[in-house]
Amino acid sequence: MKASMFLALAGLVLLFVVDYASESEEKEFPIELLSKIFAVDVFKGEERGCKGFDDSCTPGKNECCPNHACSNKHKWCKVYLGK
């Protein structure tokens, strides 16, 4: 009787330890994933010859990227919809 109680208690302790370990791994997973994503150098700004959306521009000059146009009113590049 004592041996079976001891085995049951040891099994419960083992179950709690495994559950705690899996929960801590689940909590660390999003942090590891984000650190791997943002460690890539893809997010560094690249210099380009044209100005993209919401960049300041001078109306009349062709400074904006293709499919963008310089707004006369706001003086920034906006998406050109063909109007």
UniProtKB/Swiss-Prot annotation:
On this chain, the residues bearing Leucine amide are L81
Q: List the disulfide bonds.
A: C50-C65, C57-C70, C64-C77
Identify the propeptide residues: 22-48
The organs and tissues expressing this protein are described as: Expressed by the venom gland.
One Gene Ontology cellular component annotation held by this UniProt entry: extracellular region
One Pfam family of this protein, by short name? Toxin_12
Write out the entry's keywords from A to Z.
Amidation, Disulfide bond, Ion channel impairing toxin, Knottin, Neurotoxin, Presynaptic neurotoxin, Secreted, Signal, Toxin, Voltage-gated sodium channel impairing toxin
Give the signal peptide range.
Answer: 1-21
Query: A single Gene Ontology molecular function, please?
Result: toxin activity
Domain of life of the organism encoding this protein? Eukaryota
The main place the protein resides is: secreted
PROSITE patterns hit by this protein: HWTX_1 (PS60021)
Subcellular location(s): the record lists: Secreted
What InterPro entries does the entry give? Huwentoxin-1, Huwentoxin_CS1
Q: Which family does it belong to?
A: Belongs to the neurotoxin 10 (Hwtx-1) family. 15 (Hntx-3) subfamily.
* Subunit structure, as described in the record: Monomer.
Domain annotation text? The presence of a 'disulfide through disulfide knot' structurally defines this protein as a knottin.
Role, per record: Lethal neurotoxin. Selectively blocks tetrodotoxin-sensitive voltage-gated sodium channels (Nav). Does not affect tetrodotoxin-resistant voltage-gated sodium channels or calcium channels.
Name of the featured protein: Mu-theraphotoxin-Hhn2k
